[in-house]
Amino acid sequence: MFQLLRCVPRVLGTAVAGLRAAAPSLPRLQPASRPCARPFGLLSVRARSVQLPGLLKPRGPCACGCGCSGLHTEGDKAFVDFLSDEIKEEKKIQKYKSLPKMSGGWELEVNGTEAKLVRKVAGEKITVTFNINNSIPPAFGGEEEEPSQGQKAEEQEPELTSTPNFVVEVTKDGSSKALVLDCHYPEDEIGQEDDQSDIFSIKEVSFQATGESDWKDTNYTLNTDSLDWGLYDHLMDFLADRGVDNTFADELVELSTALEHQEYISFLEDLKGFVKSK
């Protein structure tokens, strides 16, 4: 019985092999041909034979004829010429070739557009910090005066004056707190000096931890808009006793104006070099 079962697979295998040999071979299915939607010539772009649009266009010599391969237009050349003339004119009217010194024994430290004045007296350190950015007040609108006879129009232009906000920080030896007074030049007081009036005012007063560059908003800040005038006068006298008075404020305007003009000329020179660079 077992011998008959073993013979069955062999017999079936022989029969299937015979049927395969007798049946005709069918052709294999081939995929239908489809025309290419994009010509192969466009797949490989040649810079010499095909004109590339926009940013793909090969970079050639600049339009002004200097021979450089960078973006350099006739407008850039005119811009550089204008900046050259502007720098010459600004240097002609530059009042201070070097920064003026402050009276009263103040030591000056300059870091870019930020300046710091430091003074030590009787166990106290007074630090005044200001920044010249956005320190020139805008010109007030109004009817322009016509130049008088024999006077050129450019002579009528007002002199630009830098009146920055400044912060006075007073620290005492051995104290962990600093008294900070935020001061500014009121616009209506600029150019209207009086022997009895202050040319600067205190906006805010607060205590801050010494040695910290970032002051905390969680510390109480006193706004002087609603301050008792008696307390305000004592604060102004407190500053005057430490050398921050009208004379100091006048000299600070001179220093800030000189620094602002110096940085403006440096900016024009950097701008000229940037536009001119290849």
Curated annotation (Swiss-Prot):
Keywords: Acetylation, Adaptive immunity, Apoptosis, Cell membrane, Complement pathway, Cytoplasm, DNA damage, Immunity, Innate immunity, Membrane, Mitochondrion, mRNA processing, mRNA splicing, Nucleus, Phosphoprotein, Ribosome biogenesis, Secreted, Transcription, Transcription regulation, Transit peptide
Region (Interaction with MAVS): 166-209
One Gene Ontology CC term in the entry: plasma membrane
Residue range of the transit peptide in the UniProt record, numbered on this chain: 1-70
Sites bearing Phosphothreonine, chain numbering: 210
Main location (coarse class): mitochondrion
Membrane-protein topology: Peripheral membrane protein
UniProt-recorded Gene Ontology molecular function terms: adrenergic receptor binding; C5-methylcytidine-containing RNA reader activity; complement component C1q complex binding; deoxyribonuclease inhibitor activity; enzyme inhibitor activity; hyaluronic acid binding; kininogen binding; mitochondrial ribosome binding
SUPFAM superfamilies registered for this protein in UniProt: Mitochondrial glycoprotein MAM33-like
Region spans: C1q binding: 73-90
GO biological process assignments: apoptotic process; complement activation, classical pathway; cytosolic ribosome assembly; DNA damage response; innate immune response; mitochondrial RNA catabolic process; mRNA processing; negative regulation of defense response to virus
Location of the protein in the cell: Mitochondrion matrix; Nucleus; Cell membrane; Secreted
Residues carrying N6-acetyllysine: 88, 91
Modified residues (Phosphotyrosine): 185
Classification via InterPro entries: MAM33, MAM33_sf
Modified-residue entries (Phosphoserine), positions: 84, 197, 201
Task of the protein: Multifunctional and multicompartmental protein involved in inflammation and infection processes, ribosome biogenesis, protein synthesis in mitochondria, regulation of apoptosis, transcriptional regulation and pre-mRNA splicing. At the cell surface is thought to act as an endothelial receptor for plasma proteins of the complement and kallikrein-kinin cascades. Putative receptor for C1q; specifically binds to the globular 'heads' of C1q thus inhibiting C1; may perform the receptor function through a complex with C1qR/CD93.
Self-association state and partner proteins as the record states: Homotrimer; three monomers form a donut-shaped structure with an unusually asymmetric charge distribution on the surface. Interacts with CDK13, HRK, VTN, NFYB, ADRA1B, FOXC1, DDX21, DDX50, NCL, SRSF1 and SRSF9. Interacts with CD93; the association may represent a cell surface C1q receptor. Interacts with KRT1; the association represents a cell surface kininogen receptor. Interacts with CD209; the interaction is indicative for a C1q:C1QBP:CD209 signaling complex. Interacts with FBL and RRP1; the respective interactions with C1QBP are competitive. Probably associates with the mitoribosome.
Family indicated by similarity: Belongs to the MAM33 family.
Descriptive protein name: Complement component 1 Q subcomponent-binding protein, mitochondrial
Gene label: C1QBP
